Amino acid sequence: MSRYRGPRFKKIRRLGALPGLTSKRPRAGSDLRNQSRAGKKSQYRIRLEEKQKLRFHYGLTERQLLKYVRIAAKAKGSTGQVLLQLLEMRLDNILFRLGMASTIPRARQLVNHRHILVNGRIVDIPSYRCKPRDIITAKDEQKSRVMIQNSLDSFPQEELPKHLTLHPFQYKGLVNHIIDSKWIGLKINELLVVEYYSRQT
């Protein structure tokens, strides 16, 4: 299944706020109206919607998300928590959380078009897994810096998660440590996502 490129507002109206996909938010009460029209949801539907929420927020294909679930299942610790950490430490998401891109699709464009360096080297793979002490910077070109500055200008600094440090005037971000679960930027029940995939096998 390919990455979603359709109407974004339609998705947030059904699934709730997806800040990685779009800065728009559903109108107050719209999710309650949708629930009343749809009636009581089945457990399968609830798990499916949590999975879709995760997929659309991080901009993943079905195959990519399944791959992350399998990696998380083999790691030590809670599968759901490890899954969220893996997704949060992707380069495209780190750029978004730093405020260097307004959405994850925008961050992916910056990476694909070679505007971003990690530890002084250009990285053009959005799924690159960032590590503690990684230094993320904009390429030293006017075009790269203008694109990032536009995002930084509208980014509320108080929303910067604790595992990251931003130096806006240097167009530089630092990864201090692996993200703590309370700083995940999405309202999600990750256990339902794990359950969804465990029931598919």
Swiss-Prot record:
Gene3D superfamilies: Ribosomal Protein S4 Delta 41, Chain A, domain 1, RNA-binding S4 domain. GO terms for cellular component: chloroplast; small ribosomal subunit. It comes from Populus trichocarpa (Western balsam poplar). Belongs to the universal ribosomal protein uS4 family. InterPro entries: Ribosomal_uS4, Ribosomal_uS4_bac-type, Ribosomal_uS4_CS, Ribosomal_uS4_N, S4_RNA-bd, S4_RNA-bd_sf. NCBIfam families: PRK05327.1 (NF003717), rpsD_bact (TIGR01017). One of its GO terms (molecular function) is rRNA binding. The lineage of its organism: Eukaryota, Viridiplantae, Streptophyta, Embryophyta, Tracheophyta. This is Small ribosomal subunit protein uS4c. Residues 20-43 are annotated as: Disordered. It holds the Pfam family S4. It is found in: Plastid, Chloroplast. It comes from the Eukaryota. GO terms for biological process: ribosomal small subunit biogenesis; translation. Residues 89-150 form the S4 RNA-binding domain. One of the primary rRNA binding proteins, it binds directly to 16S rRNA where it nucleates assembly of the body of the 30S subunit. With S5 and S12 plays an important role in translational accuracy. SMART domains: Ribosomal_S4, S4. Part of the 30S ribosomal subunit. Contacts protein S5. The interaction surface between S4 and S5 is involved in control of translational fidelity. Keywords: Chloroplast, Plastid, Ribonucleoprotein, Ribosomal protein, RNA-binding, rRNA-binding.
